[in-house]
Amino acid sequence: MDAGIGRVKIGIINMKAIAVKPGIKDSVHLVEMPKPEIGVIPNGRGVLVKVLRVGVDGTDKEINNAEYGAAPVGDNFLVIGHEGFGVVEEVGANVTELKKGDYVVATVRRPGTSIFDIIGTNDMTTDDTYFERGINLRHGYLSEFYVDDAEFIVKVPRGLKDVGVLLEPMTVVQKGITQAYEIQRRLKVWKPRRAAVMGAGTIGLLATLVFRLRGIEVVTFGRKPKPYLNSDLIEDLGAEYISTINISVPDYAKQNGAFDIIFEASGFSPIVFDAMQTLAKNGVLVLSSVTGGDRMVEVPADRINLDFVLGNKVMVGTVNANREYFETSAKDMAQAVLEYGDWLSRLLTHPIAGLENHAHLFDTLINAKGAIKVFCEVGEDAGRPTTNSYGQASGS
């Protein structure tokens, strides 16, 4: 495949995309590659999607930092971006659940060979080699178009089109909390009253939202002292924001009580051990942060172990999400719009217009102050300009 920008193959319609060269640090660049066709998907189940917006996050930053990521077999580059949102352009002959003009989001992980992949829960795969669009061995969504099987494409209600780019991050929360409730069926009766969220970034904010939609009292811990946008967003949900600069998580719990469920989304591994010490009896702690490095900490291991054993406590990790969680995320987002108005749109702080501005996109992701969700405005929606959708000009 010819990925050189400006070197167009004769007779092939090309498109632009943002890619990296896996294993090479700071290699993000613009490529030109053939526009995909629905015919590459068997059994008439292909769907061609025009990309409108793609969110970027720490995963994209780490891939560009050459920490992980692999190109598809036969290519020397990986199109990044796993938080895609777009509109259907064309469907195969046997696609009945989608039509041209539908807003959609595609899942990220693709099936492997394990029993979990076979039954549709590829997010629980036991395969050592896995396939994730924009992350590992499959091209992502930071391109003008993509094609996939209808099985992996989820319809988004039109009322969510302005916030649809948040659906994939929402699935991280949705899976973790759903798994926690599934685990707690061991108790026969479990009605959590108090929840804690570790971290006030995008995932922490969405976790706070999901807990509040379920009527649970929430305390969200972040490092930065309030007031700032994230703390305002948390308090607008009726939750409490606490800065760990002012009080530690264990000290807060000693003064105010333990938590029935804790969702960790801080990206700071030592706080996991603080969370373990603030979990109530029969409680469940969900870990969602992917932490590299080799940080070491000293912890009261015997006491933590004793409390977990005597308190019947559970700690579980969660990663990725299958179609089920994309569908339930859309439902929760719709409920959030009804209950909290423009709350979700306030998370979309930094739009960057155009794939050609990839350098600015990554500079914003890495350096922008006050950023919650940085995203690329890739294409236009029915002729509407891709600027000023969120109260500021794209690229600002």
Residue ranges and their predicted role:
Residues 4-13, 273, 323-396:
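C-terminal hydrophobic helical "lid"/dimerization subdomain
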